[in-house]
Amino acid sequence: MAFTPFPPRQPTASARLPLTLMTLDDWALATITGADSEKYMQGQVTADVSQMTEDQHLQAAHCDAKGKMWSNLRLFRDGDGFAWIERRSVREPQLTELKKYAVFSKVTIAPDDERVLLGVAGFQARAALANLFSELPSKEKQVVREGATTLLWFEHPAERFLIVTDEATANMLTDKLRGEAELNNSQQWLALNIEAGFPVIDAANSGQFIPQATNLQALGGISFKKGCYTGQEMVARAKFRGANKRALWLLAGSASRLPEAGEDLELRMGENWRRTGTVLAAVKLEDGQVVVQVVMNNDMEPDSIFRVRDDANTLHIEPLPYSLEE
């Protein structure tokens, strides 16, 4: 029986989110299997995959030779290899790039659309899932596997879970939670990722930014001690020579329209407005507030005022749940 995605509802901020089950259609799964999986990924992504345990999931970036990110990945061990979750809009081009050197290695790299991605968040999310699984992931053990299901734990912006499972289990979970949980689509998970300060790289921004411009170093997504990987020289130079002048910011406020990925914003300079930044993602919440994830200069004043281009409404900087101090 096929699994049907849920219809959209206006997303809610994490502090007020009721128990919610989400279909994550805007994200997609991919895998690498085979004897050389670990070695191959170690030479392709910014994180140190050789140090990853079965209990961990990591942010990582897959970069081009100039250190610009094709995409960022949520990576975890899966079977005899690895699986990762990324935005669906970048999966096909990212896999094309990743496969370029695979002919020399014992690996199989493939999209995985057999499995379903679900998110569970909101009020008493843990209690709701505790009735359905014998063990749940936590800060100490962030990945748990049970049968056909892998559960990933996230701390920010509030405790939530990402479930990778087969269609039968996805339908079972939906049936079990339907009575107590609201159902929503990817936009709610996107709103939570924006709040958490997790970079959202869609097709419009693929190949545009080095990982540090999206705060990946603050999210444990870059190892500066591991051996070579594609783009490493540029990523290392940005750290050790201070070449990176950008950071990922969270803005909130009002806007008469949602800015699109790749668009710039405007910064108030006295009486005037100056174009600045690149939008990665934006969502309008049910209370009318707009939240925007944007890459801008890393020295913005905390009281800076922004707006969507030519808009009458304004946006301000909100704190992220992690520090950029090194």
From Swiss-Prot:
Covalent S-S links between cysteines: none
Record GO terms (molecular function): folic acid binding
GO cellular component, one term: cytoplasm
Residues annotated to bind folate: W27, W189
Residues spanning the membrane: none
GO terms, biological process: iron-sulfur cluster assembly; RNA modification; tRNA processing
Swiss-Prot/TrEMBL keywords: Cytoplasm, Folate-binding, tRNA processing
Localization in the cell: Cytoplasm
Name of one Pfam family that matches: GCV_T
InterPro entries cross-referenced by the UniProt entry: GCV_T_N, GcvT/YgfZ_C, tRNA-modifying_YgfZ, YgfZ/GcvT, YgfZ/GcvT_CS, YgfZ_barrel
Function description: Folate-binding protein involved in regulating the level of ATP-DnaA and in the modification of some tRNAs. It is probably a key factor in regulatory networks that act via tRNA modification, such as initiation of chromosomal replication.
HAMAP family for this protein: tRNA_modifying_YgfZ
Homology family: Belongs to the tRNA-modifying YgfZ family.
Protein name in UniProt: tRNA-modifying protein YgfZ
Lineage start: Bacteria, Pseudomonadati, Pseudomonadota, Gammaproteobacteria, Enterobacterales
